[in-house]
Each structure stands twice: as structure tokens, then as C-alpha cells.
């Protein structure tokens, strides 16, 4: 396979929540055979805006469909390559040594669980997918107004995870996959899927000088073997 490797780096733009799983996958021999790969992890909103403004990229994996739609509107997606790669769940987390016990449901006392001066760590609800899902879920359950002034907003979901892992905040809302990858936190409860839109990670190749290599990587990411790796990291594989 060495003769098929490309000389320049394949540039992947990926939602920050994918980092633990994707780092493992990128190190696998079948992926390394493609050639050098660089992954830029950030909030999907930030990555989509970069692509929209002409930043070079070969593959984009977003944490929601809205930001993939923004990229598609630029005309830069390779025809026939967009698809839904992964699913996820939204969870309420606390530091692993914390004692908070809380059942998520309509009107649940999230503000009370934060204590007198505790804040709730979430990704920015105005633009970052994890924060948008969190706000939608809390609004659906009737508790958003009680905590909206007590947020510890983060630039992406992995930063929100770190707030809780370091016990800077008593509670946070992240993806299930984030909690799986961080032993310093525990899941307090999972938000009902009906409280927010389905959490979908779409993927697409971006027009570039080496669409062939991007297609090869996309095929590997959509394989059952790699789907099993994603599942170990807390994602739902949406490919057969």
C-alpha cells in the first residue's frame, strides 16, 4: 500500500467531541496507509465557518446537520459523499467523586443541584452543537430559565467536560462519548431523546486536490470495523 500513500497531508476537520475516538482510528494501519493525516479539532461551528471562508480541508465531520448544511451551501462538498456517520446521547455529568443524585425529567431541580453558587458547564448554546442540544433539552423540560444565568459556557464540548473533570463546576452537560472517555467524571443521568433533536454526526468530503484519498478515508470511517471502535467510545454507528 505504500505506493498509494500521498505526499501531502490529508486535512480532516472534526468536531471536538470526536477526538478520543478519531485519534485511535487515525493510528490504525489501514488509515496510516493512506498517508499523513492531520486532524483539526474544534467546535463544528468554528470549522464550518473556516470552510465557508475558503480554508483548505479534505474531510469534514460535524456534530450536527445545521453546520454541515452551511458547508453544503458553499458548494464545496464532493457530490455523493455526504452521509450520517454517527449518533450520540446527551448526559448530565458530575465530578467522579461528587455525591449529586438527580433524575432528569420535566421540571427537575437542576438549579438546586448546582448549590448556592455552582455553575453549569455547557458548550456555547448560541453556536456549538452540544450547547444547542443542551439548551433545547433544558427548555423542553422546563428548566432552562432557572439555570440560564448560571452557565459556565465553553468554546466546545471538550472544554465543558474539562470544567467538570477538574471540579471547577459541580455539573455539566456533554455527550455520552465525552463521559466515556474521561474517568474523572460520572454520568448522573441521560437526557430523554425526546427532549432534543437527534444527535447526528454527518460527514462529507470537501473539494480539494486529492478527493481520492478523502474518499478512501471516508470509506474506512464508514466500515463496520471502525464503527465498532466508535461504539467503544460511546457513539452510535449509523452505518451498517
Cite the ranges covered by each PLM segment:
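Exported/periplasmic ABC-transporter solute-binding proteins
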Residues: 4-55, 62-65, 69-240
Amino acid at each position: 500500500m505504500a505506493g498509494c500513500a500521498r505526499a501531502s497531508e490529508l486535512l480532516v476537520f472534526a468536531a471536538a467531541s470526536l477526538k478520543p475516538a478519531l485519534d485511535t482510528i487515525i493510528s490504525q494501519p489501514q488509515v496510516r496507509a493512506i498517508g499523513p493525516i492531520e486532524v483539526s479539532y474544534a467546535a463544528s461551528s468554528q470549522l464550518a465557518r473556516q470552510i465557508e471562508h475558503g480554508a483548505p480541508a479534505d474531510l469534514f465531520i460535524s456534530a450536527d446537520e445545521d453546520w454541515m448544511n452551511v458547508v453544503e451551501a458553499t458548494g464545496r462538498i464532493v457530490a455523493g459523499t455526504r452521509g450520517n456517520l454517527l449518533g450520540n446521547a446527551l448526559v448530565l455529568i458530575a465530578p467522579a467523586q461528587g455525591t449529586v443524585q438527580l433524575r432528569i425529567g420535566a421540571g427537575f431541580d437542576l438549579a438546586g443541584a448546582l448549590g448556592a453558587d455552582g455553575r453549569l458547564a455547557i458548550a456555547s448554546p448560541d453556536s456549538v452543537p452540544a450547547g444547542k442540544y443542551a439548551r433545547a433539552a433544558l427548555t423542553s423540560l422546563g428548566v432552562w430559565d432557572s439555570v440560564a444565568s448560571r452557565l459556565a459556557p465553553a468554546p466546545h464540548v471538550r472544554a465543558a467536560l474539562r470544567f467538570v473533570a477538574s471540579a471547577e463546576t459541580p455539573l455539566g452537560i456533554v455527550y455520552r462519548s465525552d463521559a466515556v472517555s474521561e474517568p474523572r467524571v460520572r454520568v448522573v443521568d441521560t437526557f430523554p431523546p425526546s427532549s432534543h433533536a437527534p444527535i447526528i454526526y454527518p460527514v462529507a468530503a470537501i473539494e480539494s486536490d486529492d478527493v481520492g484519498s478523502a474518499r478512501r478515508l471516508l470509506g474506512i470511517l464508514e466500515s463496520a470495523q471502525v464503527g465498532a471502535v466508535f461504539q467503544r467510545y460511546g457513539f452510535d454507528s449509523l452505518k451498517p
